[in-house]
C-alpha cells in the first residue's frame, strides 16, 4: 500500500515540474542579441612595466570608462592618470598569488567560452521578456579578490577569480574569503551569477519598501524565478548555488521550515512578518547555514522558500506574465504557496 501511495504522489510532482519547465521553455533562436565580451584579465596580466604609457593608452581605449572604475573604485588605486599605478600593483605582496590565480583562470578557457555562450542565451531570454532591458558589455576580469560580480549602467563585469575551479589555489585565498564562500566558487555558476547580478541591480532592483522577512523572501524568490526563466535548462541547484545534497535538504525540510516561518511569538507576530534586519538576515543572508534554523540547514532557506512561492504563484496564475508577477506584493504569494507540494 505504501509503495502505491509513493507512486501516486510522485507522478503529480513530476507533472507539475514539467508544466513549469514547459512554460519557461521559449524559442529565442531568432534573437539578434550578441554579447560583446572583453578580457581585462588578459589585457592587464602579467603587468608589463616596460612601456607604461602604451599600456595605459591600450587599457583606456579598450575598456573606456570601466578602466577608471576598475582601477580607482574597485582596486582603490590612483587610476590610469597616475603612471605609478601599474608598477605599484606589480610590487604588491598579493601580486604573485594574483598571477597564480590567473594561471588557473587561463586553464578554464573552454568552460569560460561555454559560460559566455550560456550567458548570451540568457540575455536573449531577457530580451524576450523585457525588450526594453539593456544588454550590457561583458568584461571578464581578475578582480584581485575584490568582486565576483560588478555592474554599471552599461557593463556587467565578472571576477573570474571568484569562479576558479582549482581547490589548491583557493586554499591560498585571503582569509576574508571564508570556506563557505570558496565552496560556491564554481565555474558552473559564472553565467547564472552574472545574470543574477544584472537582474538584481538593473532589471528588478530592490525598492527599499521591503520591510518584513516575507518581503525579502519574495523579492529574492522573484529574482531566482527570473533566473529560471533566463536559463530554463539549468538545474535548480545551479540556480540557487546549492549542491544536490543541500537542495535535497530543502525539499525534505520544507514543511518544517514553513512551520518555523509561521510560528507566532509572544507579540502575536509570525516570523515571516519580522522587521528586524538582524533577524531577517538569519534567513536570507549567505553563510555556511541558515542561522535561524540550525548548523545542518542549507543556507538562505528564506530565499529558497521565496523561489517556491514565486513558482507556485505562477503555476496557479498561468495568465500572469513575468513582468506582471514582479509587480505583485509579497502577501499575494502567500495565498498560493503550498509547502506540502
Language-model segments: which ranges?
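N-terminal mature-domain "stem" immediately C-terminal to a signal peptide or N-terminal signal-anchor/transmembrane
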Residues: 20-88
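Sec-dependent N-terminal signal peptides
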Residues: 4-13
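Short, mixed-charge aromatic SLiMs
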Residues: 149-151, 249-257, 326-340
Amino acid at each position: 500500500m505504501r509503495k502505491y501511495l509513493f507512486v501516486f504522489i510522485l507522478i503529480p510532482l513530476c507533472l507539475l515540474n514539467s508544466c513549469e519547465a514547459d512554460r519557461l521553455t521559449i524559442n529565442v533562436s531568432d534573437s539578434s542579441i550578441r554579447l560583446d565580451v572583453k578580457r581585462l584579465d588578459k589585457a592587464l596580466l602579467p603587468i608589463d612595466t616596460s612601456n607604461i604609457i602604451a599600456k595605459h593608452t591600450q587599457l583606456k581605449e579598450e575598456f573606456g570608462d570601466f578602466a577608471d572604475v576598475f582601477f580607482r573604485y574597485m582596486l582603490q588605486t590612483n587610476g590610469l592618470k597616475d603612471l605609478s599605478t601599474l608598477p605599484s600593483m606589480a610590487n604588491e605582496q598579493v601580486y604573485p598569488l594574483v598571477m597564480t590565480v590567473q594561471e588557473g583562470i587561463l586553464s578554464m578557457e573552454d568552460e569560460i567560452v561555454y559560460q559566455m555562450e550560456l550567458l548570451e542565451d540568457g540575455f536573449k531570454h531577457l530580451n524576450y521578456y523585457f525588450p526594453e532591458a539593456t544588454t550590457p558589455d561583458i568584461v571578464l576580469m581578475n578582480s584581485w579578490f575584490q568582486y565576483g560580480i560588478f555592474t554599471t549602467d552599461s557593463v556587467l563585469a565578472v571576477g573570474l577569480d571568484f569562479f576558479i575551479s582549482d581547490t589548491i589555489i583557493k586554499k591560498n585565498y585571503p582569509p576574508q574569503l571564508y570556506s563557505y564562500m570558496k565552496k560556491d566558487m564554481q565555474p558552473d555558476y559564472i553565467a547564472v551569477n552574472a545574470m543574477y547580478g544584472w537582474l538584481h541591480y538593473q532589471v528588478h532592483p530592490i525598492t527599499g519598501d521591503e520591510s518584513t522577512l516575507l518581503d525579502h523572501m519574495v523579492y529574492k524568490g522573484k529574482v531566482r524565478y527570473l533566473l529560471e526563466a533566463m536559463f530554463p535548462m539549468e538545474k535548480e541547484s545551479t540556480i540557487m548555488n546549492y549542491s544536490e545534497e543541500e537542495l535535497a535538504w530543502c525539499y525534505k525540510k520544507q514543511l518544517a521550515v514553513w512551520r518555523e516561518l509561521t510560528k507566532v511569538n509572544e507579540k502575536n507576530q509570525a516570523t515571516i512578518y519580522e522587521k528586524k534586519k538582524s533577524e531577517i538576515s538569519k534567513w536570507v543572508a549567505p553563510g555556511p547555514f541558515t542561522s535561524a534554523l540550525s548548523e545542518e540547514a542549507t543556507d538562505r532557506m528564506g530565499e529558497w522558500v521565496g523561489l517556491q512561492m514565486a513558482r507556485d504563484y505562477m503555476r496557479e496564475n498561468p495568465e500572469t506574465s513575468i513582468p506582471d508577477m514582479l509587480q505583485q506584493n509579497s502577501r499575494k504569494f502567500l495565498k498560493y504557496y503550498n509547502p506540502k507540494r
